[in-house]
Every structure is written in structure tokens, then in C-alpha cells.
Amino acid sequence: PSPPRSTETIVVTGTYEPVPLGESDRSITVVPAEKEYQILFNDPTGFLRLDPSVDLQARGPNNIQTDVSIRGAHYGQTLVLWNGLRLNDTQTGHHNLDTPIPIESLERVEILKGAGSTLYGSDASGGVVNFISKPPETSEVHLRTSVGNFGINQQHFQLLLARKGWTEDLTADRDFSSGFRFDRDHRSLSAASLSHHTGRLGTTDVMLAASDRAYGADQFYGNYPSWERAKSWFAAIRQTFGSSMETNFSYRRHTDLFVLYRDRPELFTNRHVLETYQGAARRRLSLGQNTTFHYGTDASYDAIRSSNLGIHTRGRAAAFGAIDFRALGRFALNLGAREEVYRGLRHQFSPSVTGSVWISPKLKLRGGVSHAFRLPSFTELYYHDAANTGSPDLKPEQAWSYEAAAEWRPADRFQVQTTLFQRREHNNIDYVRQSPDETWRATNFRRLRVTGVETGLRRSLRGNRELTLSYTGLRLRTDPEPGLLSKYASNYPVHSGAVHFQGMVGGVLLLRTRFGVLQRNGGDPYLLCELGVARAYGSLRPFVQFSNLTNTGYQEVPGVAMPGRTITAGIEIRIRFN
């Protein structure tokens, strides 16, 4: 049987080649980031909140400092990509979302839920977040400015150039706030250049980006009035050779200046400088009408110089291969494996088996088993201060993920899906202690098991409007030594649900609203409401955004308060010149 055919979204995350979303044999959420609706979001992480399986643990607004978790995994077990290139930070997973990605350049965000180490290597235990940009199709200039309570002052600039054979996307962003309370101010600057060229060999993409964030960090990592400044630089080039081969190389530099007492930096100050080099080559070989073999290799090198961690390096190299059997509208089966070698010829083997089958034109079943791993960060290995201590003998985390799902599409504009999953971890890394008076120490847990369910309904309405309802429930079991207190593993959402609507109303206004309810382990449920309204047409587009509309008091990281009701209003100017 053949499934219904409509305009299908193409996905590139969790798969070795682009496939229609309806044909994917993995659990993937695609969050559109159309240019029209970007005016109703402040930063790229806002799109992640539309999937309740993604838990953002923010220490401030507008992605000043945010941890990301998928399916109950901790902050270091989610891999962050930009156009398929790794952005994860080997100093600490707290910086994985410290990215210079401009929201103006996004086309969509793809979220792979479940293990992804067979394709991507270390860190993809809980899942993968891939921010995807798109070359511009027209030449335009966009200017946006806005102000709000808590001293919010924001500006965005974008220049788009589209010519035959090449395009350019230049952006610059500024975000200031005096803070909603003492020592919670922030200043953020970023700029990026995305160049795209089409030639005889194939396509060439050059990505250049930088960001500078300085922010008050009161209570971020303990009962201290701290301050932090993080800078990030990223450069990458990607070259395709027809449709069968791709190569890429990237460089990332990240600096972190941390002051424990903001007004007394001489007491305790850390300076970290991390540099990462990465390269990869992938090739596709057709073995028949429905069979494709994918293979490739990648390597990376990390070097850190730190006043606290010392000087350390880490090199990795990997080879992978996968055979894909796929008949569109009937079935898919993928068998993959990856061998990764690191530090002293130690190695990790990560196999996976995934598949799907159409039972009827409206019903698809899919499932899979996959292995993932994560190498300890430099902070987990070597950090030390009065409150936290690393352990140089930590072992890599291991995880096996299992899932089964059903997708029902009774009509082109209506979809329901439910997924059952379990992740069994071994040597999970967390900070533990026996009493509040002791220091947190990085330790391997023997076993940890996460079991959960995801269910969602998506309904496309007339007038380019869409309504989604989604829920994720989790249960976590672990066996630490009796009497040990956990710092991160226990901070997961037991229940998380969301209702999201966006579309045009009255023919002239864009409306976006989200109602989310979340209950963390051991805590009470709380409600967060977001609302955004903007003019849909014209060169001048006023807008207003409301965050935490109900003025809920809540914490996503224990001990770190989040802002109350926030109102931001502004105007965007669009000028097209071709």
C-alpha cells in the first residue's frame, strides 16, 4: 500500500541521505522556522520548546545560558549541530547551546529523539538537535528593534543577497538587559556570514560566525553572586561532489571567563580556552533500485588551556558504514555501525538497527535498537573548586536505546503518533555527595534506566494555520550507592505537555501562542504561557511578544530563578531590492 502523498517535508537528521519525513524510520520532529514567524521568537532555542520531549534548563532568558536535554538525558548527552556540523563543547556540556547561530538565517530545526552515535559519534545518547539554514532566494535587508521590561533592548540586522550561482546571508544581533533581579543582567552580541555557491563540482558552503555573551550568574553554580563571559568563534566549509559525496572541515574556538564573586574577582577566577578541529567525508553508493550503501570517516582534535583544568588534548577518529533498504511507501530497513578510536587506542563500537513498514495507506509502524556513548568532558575529568571536583578516572558513558512507534494519518492535514521508548545506561556520569556539607564529585553510576512515552497530534487548518498537542512522560530509575545525593540526574520532567497554535488571523495578523505544563521530579506542576502577535504583510511590521504571561514563579535549574512576566514590543523593517 502507498501512504497519502502531499507536499512532504524532507529531513536530513538521523538519516544518511535526505528522505521525506513520512518515510523516516527514526523519531524526528521538524519545527518550521519560517521567516514570517521568526519575528515572534527571540532566539533559536524558542523553537525547541515546541517539543515536550526537549527539556530546556535555562539559567536566564534568550539563551544566555541554557542546557538542553532530550528524553530525560542530562545536559551533556544531547548533540547540537548547525547544518549537520558539530557544535558540542568538550570543556562542558553547559556550553553546547552557546552558539552563534542567527535566528534570522534558520529555515527549520530538526530534533532526533533517541541514540544517534552510529552516525554522529559521542554525545548523541539522548538525541540530536540540528539547526538548519537555507540560502536566500531574494535580495533583501531586514532591520528589527525592540524594547521591553527588565531593561530589554534588542536589535537585529540581516542582509540577503541572491545572484545566479551564489548567495550571501549576513547577520548581526544585539541583546541587552539590566536583569529582572540582582546580578542577572546580560549583554549579548553576535554576527554571522553564510555563503553558498553552486558550481561544476557541486555546492560549496562557507560558514563564519562569532558571539560574545557576558552575564550576571547569581546562583548559577552555587550560592555565589558570580559573573561569566563566554565567547565563541566558528568557521566551516562544506563541499559536495554531485549527489554521492560530501566533505567538510570546521574550526571552533570557545573562551570562558568565570568569576565566582562578581565584586571580588581576585578571590576566584577561571579562564578556559578551547579549540576544536573537525573534518569528515561521506559517500553514497547505489546497489540497486531500493538498496544504498553509505560509508565515511571523520576525525576531531580538541585542545584546552585552562587556569583550573590545566592543559589537555583529545583526538578521535572514526569510520562508519550503513546499508539502507528502502521502498518509498512500503518499508525501510537500515543497518549501521560505527567504530570510533580515541585516547590511547581505546575504542567504541556503536551499531544500530531501525526499520518501518506501512501497514495501510494511513498507518505506519516503526522501531529500532541503537547504541550510544559519551566521552567525559574536560570539566568532569579535571575541574576542582570549593563546591565541585572532577575525577580523572571516569569511564565513558554507554547507552542502549529501544523504541517502537505508530503513526496514523487519516487525512493529509491530520496526524497522530505515539512512541514508547527505553534507554538503558551504564557508567552514567553525574555529580554526587553524601551530605550537603560535602563537595560534589563527578562519579560513574553503575546503571540508569529511562522509560517513557511520547504522543502528539498535529492538525493543519485552513489559512496556513496549525494546531499541535503533545505530551511526554518519563520515569527514571538508577542504582547509586545508598545515601548518595545526585546533582543532575534527578532534575528531569516527569510530565511535560504543550498546546501550540500559530497562523494568520483576520487576514492581517500573525498569531503564535503556546501553553506548556511541566512537572519536574519531586516538584509541583507549573504552567507557562507565551503569546506573540505581528503584522503579516508590508515593509513595516510591528510586533509584541509576551513570555511567562501568567507570571509563574519557576526554576528550570534548581536554585536559579527565572523571569516573571516579560513584554517585548518592536518593529521590523523589510526592504527588497531585486
Language-model segments: which ranges?
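N-terminal periplasmic "start-of-domain" segments of outer-membrane beta-barrel proteins
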Residues: 8-44, 67, 75
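Extracytoplasmic beta-strand/coil segments of soluble accessory domains associated
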Residues: 45, 49-85, 89, 107
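Short acidic/polar hinge/loop motifs at secondary-structure boundaries
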Residues: 86-113, 131-134
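Short strand-turn segments of transmembrane beta-barrel domains in outer membranes
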Residues: 116, 128, 133-161, 171-172, ...
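Flexible loop and strand-edge segments within Gram-negative outer membrane beta-barrel domains
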Residues: 177-190, 197, 201-276, 388
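Conserved C-terminal beta-signal and adjacent last beta-strands/turns
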Residues: 196-199, 488-578
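Outer-membrane beta-barrel signature, preferentially recognizing the C-terminal barrel domain
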Residues: 221-242, 272-274, 358, 371-426, ...
